[in-house]
């Protein structure tokens, strides 16, 4: 069995790890870094850039550079979070089958397809590092991700050519990495604040058991929101000073985003920073520059309400676990946004305890995922991971009420049944509307999908017995079935429609990804050939210049013609590897012929010189 990789598919950055020779370690990408920006860009030349190369060109290509795609993963277009994303992100968010999608140059891409491109890069980097093909993976998601978001994440893995063995929660994964070697039982809190999501989880670890006691969070709160507060502040200040709204200029907005992100990072270690963006825009009076000093205190004032929200969630989750704060042994900080000093101060104050910073907040989740992969494969034995469902699951019943079948905090995998009946006399069919959430009424919760159970025999209301079964697998993905106990008729739904993609669409995307992988490979080969051709042309031109009159006129003409042909081919940006190599071969042949002729031309002179030297030698003996 090949190695299993663990992937932390993050909002801002992603990370991949592997378990080998008794330890889990992070795999560096081809650029030599341990994390890869979760950024995908489409260039005007038709190239698809992923990671650092995509992030570097974001300012000049904002509408075709996709970042924070995780924020709309598994979202329907009419959800509030989708509307917020549309207002915030520079690229065009649209819909496909009612679910969020993006439009680039007239083509529709789902969040799954964009995430798949990030996953494909991580897969390729892992294969290059390990020297073998990799298909099996464990991918992490925020603990508070709902069924649709989990399903969409798994689909992204499938499109990327991965066999997703398990979807596990990020804080659980972090706890696995942290607590695997702990022999004594201890209760810990994992506070996970990433780029786009927040989770807090209470776990019990020890003796190779990691058990989730309670979890909660916000799938739409993270470092991006800290950045957005700062972007709003800078844009509003600039508008007050100049009357120009930078939010209407996507290129300026992208520069603001980068500046905000950098300022946030600088203020984690400094008390003051300067944001300096020359030529941010222009009006009739000339170019405008944005220069603003920002103190840490000012920044903390902008984000304090967001941090306070995370502290409120801590209190709820510790209470849900049936614990008091003084029973918590360790607070493990996970996610890049936990580097913000205010976050650390407030969490420390909440527990009146020093924080555990022994783990790398950017890498620990991937490391834990790799351990889980090794558990599934059998390389790590006697480790038990007991996770829970973050939200209650149920169905809509009479009066638009949500009736819960599986309560939040239930250990998964799990299976539960409940018997319902009809609401009207002689009702021949029932519609099962599957819901996820904590509110009392159906309309306030998320509908995951619905299906009909038909062919119920005529009977007075309340008489038929319809057994509804909810089955959650180890990935936290739900299957619901309904059965009429009198007739045995049954209907089942695996919640697939919630992600907006059918099985056929996913298969098509897998094929499309493979096709583009081949296209990308050909494009890379063409780039390599182009670089080699440039090098050859330069070398030949240099040799011609150095040899000057020593080159025969006919040879010079042939070489120049081959050079011109090669240069002309290189002007065509769509020239294939084969076309370039053909012209290179022609140039190599005439330049090699030239070298041979030059050698032959010099050879007789060498012989004559030798003869002349020999003539000067006196044949005599020396005493």
Swiss-Prot record:
Ranges of Basic and acidic residues composition bias in the record: 595-615
Keyword Chaperone among record annotations: yes
Induction notes from the record: By stress conditions e.g. heat shock.
Assigned keywords, A-Z: ATP-binding, Chaperone, Nucleotide-binding, Phosphoprotein, Stress response
Record region (Disordered): 595-623
GO molecular function, one term: ATP-dependent protein folding chaperone
Residues with Phosphothreonine modification: 197
Top-rank taxon: Bacteria
Family designation: Belongs to the heat shock protein 70 family.
Classification via HAMAP family: DnaK
The protein's role, per its UniProt record: Acts as a chaperone.
NCBIfam families recorded: PRK00290.1, PRK05183.1, prok_dnaK
Name the record gives this protein: Chaperone protein DnaK
Organism: Campylobacter jejuni subsp. jejuni serotype O:2 (strain ATCC 700819 / NCTC 11168)
Gene coding for it: dnaK
